[in-house]
Amino acid sequence: MKKQWILWIGLLIGMISPLHAQEENPMEPTPKLGTLTFEDGSTYSGEIELGQMSGIGTQYFPDGTWRTGHFQDNKYLADFIAKPPWHMVGLDFMLDREYIMETFSMDLKVLNDVPDSLQLYIAPFGTSELNGTQLYGGIQTQCGGYYSVIKGENSGRFIPLGRAVIFSRWGTRASLALKKAEGGVCESSGYEDDFVSVRNTLKWNKGTYTITLVKTKETVMLDSVLHTYVEMQVYDHKKKQTFSGGSLAFPGTTLTLNQRNYIFFELYGKRVNVNKLPHLKFVCENYRVNGNPVEIPFVASIYEKNYPSYADATYNEGKFKIELGKPNGKPLTEGDGMNYRMLNEK
């Protein structure tokens, strides 16, 4: 199983150098992740070419400040402008086994006020599978959708919601695959492959929220297969209220939750100067299936290549701690299409 996890991440393939590697062309060097220390007391973490700051990285100064951007031959060229969507950090984790699911829940702690201007998607259920159908969901600072879906297409004007809960699944465009909550909206589209989604207003900010996937007793026939609706609910601990994001249909009447799961924190919609991002902290913890705590024997943090490492994540005893908006100088392992750091492996 451990080998399967590593193979899934796809991070070791391509990292093995041939026995007799050719000398690198100095005119077109390949950037490698690393760190540098300079006589003025500053340090650097990021891409390095020919022993110099060259590529995307962060320079740290003795007074505690830093600058993140593009470098060439030890010179700072420009601030890094992140093009959306940007998964600032992902957390690939494995449950100890598959589960027959009635409920799947977790607690999200937002430890700072998050500004409306930051289009942030927090997805504690960043990728899960029920009976082989992928789903994802969480909360967003800016969200919206449409009143209805007709023949697989969105109908009517776009309705902005502001802060909201969002729940999506892949593999269909059918209107019967979704049920809006009261006051909610929906979407059916193909820009991320075929998917349907339900959304509803949730005035969230600093606080604690329990997010739960709930298997309902409602079923529907889709493509000659009986499906069961699953509702996403959010309990606001401060308001002591439960809010519904809506429901999506999944094939079968007995729902099996896959071992493999994922969390992501994504900036979407707007380009941002990373040096001007707010510093934010979050905790994802207390993952439970059918009300019972689950073991999490494997965790790896994932970072997109071609972006700076501008988030940090740790894991200990069922608790994921995430920081955004601050450069992460911890060493990462370079993989194929992504960089990663092992956080837990049993």
What are these language model-derived features?
Residues 1-4:
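Positively charged n-region of N-terminal signal peptides that target proteins for export
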Residues 8-15:
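Bacterial N-terminal signal peptides
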Residues 20-86, 151:
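Glycine/tyrosine- and acidic-biased, solvent-exposed loop/turn segments at the edges of beta-strands
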Residues 61, 108-112, 215-217, 236:
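Short beta-strand segments enriched in hydrophobic/aromatic residues
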Residues 81-101, 107-116, 261, 267-346:
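Activation corresponds to long, low-complexity, non-globular regions
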Residues 83-183, 334-345:
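Secretory/extracellular carbohydrate-interaction modules
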Residues 186-208:
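Short, aromatic/His-centered strand-loop micro-motif at the edge of beta-sheets
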Residues 203-243:
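Carbohydrate-binding surfaces in secreted/extracellular proteins
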